[in-house]
Amino acid sequence: MTALKTLVDAGCQLVLARLLFPDAFGILAFLISAAGFFCYIADLGGGKYIIQKKDLTQEDADTVFTFELLVGVGLALAWLLGAGWILHILKKNTLLPYAAPFSLWIALERFQLPRFILEKRMEFGKSNIATFLGILAGSVISVFLALRGCGVYSLIIGLIFRSLVTALFVWHYSDMKPRLKFRADLAAPYMRFGLPLAVTSLFVFYYWNVDYIIVGKFLNDTQLGYYYIAFKFPHYILQLQSLVSTVVYPAFARTKDDEQLMRGFKLATKYSSALALLPCVGVLALGEGIVRYGLGEKWMPALRPFQIFTCLAAVRMITIHWYDVYLSKG
């Protein structure tokens, strides 16, 4: 299922790259980075807290969901009202007509919490099916709209449908469904766990997105589109890695001692290395043909960044499991 999800997502991006012009991807990259700041702030580590909590109750899930949903809705409104000012500061006023739908995306992302309940219970099949159906729905919508000439809106609406459908199915599959209830005494340990993680998430956001903001501000949407696609395709191997982490992290969280945890860390790193190095070698050797015949001639300016990002993605995939170890220790 993991491979199928990545294949469908990558295949959709490949089709969209052939149907749309690079500037559409540049607009998406800039806006998803700007709006993503609000989305990251709304994620206070509730999902990770649920996975690592040894004696999770319905009230715990209710408290986490209620708090993060309220924060998410508030930040979605903040983006809706403040996007014009933010884009003006960044001198990207031309993107304002595309900004409003991202407020819906910010809010919908807060409905993903039952996925972490499924993963805590090691029900990865249900979690993966929900994620796959979200990817499939978003892909179908995006390609359909692109064929109808909707341009960048095909990418934005596809993103929203992906979040919506995934949320619907994780709620369907989860036996424990969070409710709108809040208990302050249960929020205290959650906040102690989540706030440091939220601060870390902001640094992660900066790490992954500041380059899009810089490229988009000082270059044009087309050049940012080249950069985005060059970055996007190599990092499908990191999508595989993140899905591996959905298995590795709960397993690490269940270890009884540091020795067992270290054995798991070494084994996970070993297999991640084998998975990462093969595409790296292939892209270095055959990158020109992959871009020309896969994406199309219009994407040839993305070749060198594509090769560089593939190597960087491989290195990151090999070294990422320290983060799972850190979280598993609470």
Question: Model regions: which residues?
Answer:
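Alpha-helical transmembrane segments of multi-pass membrane proteins
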Residues: 37-38, 77, 81, 91-114, ...
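Membrane-interface junctions at transmembrane-helix termini in multi-pass inner-membrane proteins
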Residues: 48-58, 107-131, 153, 174, ...
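Interhelical loop/hinge segments that connect adjacent transmembrane helices in multipass membrane
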Residues: 125, 129, 168-209, 213, ...
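Hydrophobic alpha-helical transmembrane segments
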Residues: 95-103, 128-175, 192-194, 200, ...
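Specific pore-lining/lateral-gate transmembrane helices of multi-pass inner-membrane transport
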Residues: 52-67, 226-330
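Membrane-water interface segments that mark the loop-to-transmembrane alpha-helix transition
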Residues: 1-9, 31, 36, 40-84, ...
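Signature of the first transmembrane helix
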Residues: 1-44, 71-83, 134-143, 158-163, ...
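Helix-terminus/linker motif at the lipid-water interface of multi-pass membrane proteins
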Residues: 10-24, 87-88, 144-146, 205-236, ...
